[in-house]
Amino acid sequence: MIDMLKKGLEKTLKFFPRLEDLAEVFDPLHRGEAFASSPNPRSIERKYILNVPTLKAKSSVEKITDGQSYEILGQPTGFEISEVKTAEGEIKIRIDFVNNIFADVMKIMCNVGLVLMMVFAAFYFAGINPADNLNLEVQKWSEPAEKFWSDVKGIHSTGYSWFLQNPLDPENAILLSVTLLALTPVIGILLTIPRSTGALRVIFLVIAVEFVYAIFRVMMGGGPMGH
């Protein structure tokens, strides 16, 4: 019984981000840039060497170690490359570090958003802290949106920011979780901006501004909210 509980707990904890995941996102490898921490072993310019028995290197390079079983080139050039772990004997794919940051943010944010959505959905169906009169909503459902919300909740709102008025309502909290999932790409892009350079940074800035403008335009403007 105890073993079953331990296995269940381990599976549940996998949904939540680990400290290592957060460290990879917020602790850059290069000193002197945004979000950079104090000097540490991770601050070394590093590239990972791929050794595959079926491949033969055309030239040899100088190798050193940082004490963590990583092989490091003396002078890396271009973008930093991070390694994707695979089973032994398979070719390891190497991806650009900006893509790695974006993927980590997507994984963490999606896991958190889905967990919150399931928790608040359980509260809603269990009737915990309800803020709605479902019988009244059914009676008023055929009314126009503006009159419906006035009669049911006593609020007058336009756009889609109405669910922020009472975040403790499970129905509104579910929408907050959906909003968190919708914002995941924006947050991923914002966290890649400090690690990018040149034209790529400009492109990320433009994309982020477009996202933020579109979000606030819909939430704060528009016609009466629907139902």
UniProtKB/Swiss-Prot annotation:
GO CC, alphabetical: plasma membrane
UniProt-annotated location(s): Cell membrane
Membrane topology label: Multi-pass membrane protein
Spans through the membrane: 109-128, 173-192, 199-221
Keyword field contains Membrane: yes
Domain of life (superkingdom): Archaea
UniProt keyword annotations, A-Z: Cell membrane, Membrane, Transmembrane, Transmembrane helix
Protein name: Uncharacterized protein AF_1633
